[in-house]
């Protein structure tokens, strides 16, 4: 969500007059959430600006004991651990899109997964279990990769990517 707050010297510490939540859909990635939050912020600042300018807004101090700090996400955190459950992996793919992105390696090359959904196949974690790049995960789950980007190349739908790919059913990806 977003908060309408006074700016003070410390990061995110000013008093808040209003806070708004955003309903998230399962298929939202970080980029989509950022876009939605930007639109919500633009709308809500307009709703609050008159009260703020006329000193009618009621600002309340934040409870600083509940404050948290998110450290910078490092590129290496995008490496997929196929032993994790499919929902966790899809969460990582969506949460790290577009930058730094969630990725795997095959034959020394990096592949960024841009979009994926839950699959229904079973195999060993990291094993490609279909000709359409469905990959086995932990908990006897799988994900279907829908869009991918090979290092240094343009993004591709999986049907297009698989035409020239060396990643085949039975391959193990890391």
Describe the residue ranges of each PLM region.
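Donor/substrate-binding cores of folate-linked one-carbon enzymes
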Residues: 1-70, 76
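Active-site loop ensemble at the mouth of alpha/beta enzyme cores that anchors a bound cofactor
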Residues: 71-72, 78-80, 87
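A short catalytic or substrate-binding loop motif that flags glycine-/basic-rich loops and adjacent residues
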Residues: 72-74, 95-96
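Short, flexible active-site loop motifs that bind/organize anionic cofactors or intermediates
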Residues: 23, 79, 151
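An anion-binding loop in the catalytic cleft
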Residues: 83-174
